[in-house]
Design a protein with these regions (language model features):
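A broad, low-specificity signal for short, low-complexity segments enriched in glycine/proline
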Residues: 1-6, 40-44, 67-71
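Flexible, gly/pro- and Lys/Arg-enriched active-site loops
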Residues: 13, 28-35, 50-53, 57-148
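Short, charge-patterned binding micro-sites
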Residues: 18-44
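N-terminal beta1-alpha1 ligand-phosphate binding loop
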Residues: 1-14, 20-24
Length: 148
């Protein structure tokens, strides 16, 4: 995950401006696997949402991401949760992310960097208050964990 953030930040058309704490999360969906690590980042970019998605997918491929099993183990998973006030409903790009408000493992790190961000008419902090964060723990408090 740190490598993916550094790769984004190294691009001339992207700048990582904030990164959440790193969280360890029990597996979700398919539970017979190791814990996941989750974080969120705020990225300023001159790329369109679709172009940013293409960059993220390239980073995933370079990091040997294989899409074998839904909710299964993976080396990296980069999602675009929001993109300004834009809405996208294509199969490959759904923004805002359609399930982000149901997932504490998304909302906790997102609240670290954008607690007041409105998503579907409510701030992230409100969505987080309604979610089940059981088992999610901070793995690294240092917000510079990704810098290596």
């Amino acid at each position: 995950m740190a490598l993916a953030l550094r790769r984004l930040d190294a691009r001339p058309d992207c700048r990582v401006t904030a990164v959440s704490r790193l969280y360890r999360t029990p597996p979700w969906g398919k539970t017979d696997q190791a814990d996941f690590y989750n974080s969120c980042a705020l990225v300023e970019t001159t790329l369109s949402a679709k172009a940013l998605l293409a960059v993220c997918l390239d980073i995933e491929r370079d990091m040997k991401r294989e899409r074998i099993e839904r909710w299964g183990p993976r080396t990296i998973d980069i999602d675009i949760l929001t993109y300004d006030d834009e809405r996208h409903g294509e199969e490959a790009l759904k923004v805002p992310h359609p399930r982000m408000t149901e997932r504490a493992f998304v909302l906790m790190p997102l609240a670290d960097i954008a607690a007041d961000l409105p998503v579907d008419g409510r701030p992230v902090s409100d969505w987080l208050g309604d979610s089940d964060a059981g088992g999610i723990v901070v793995a690294n408090e240092n917000r510079a964990w990704w810098r290596g």
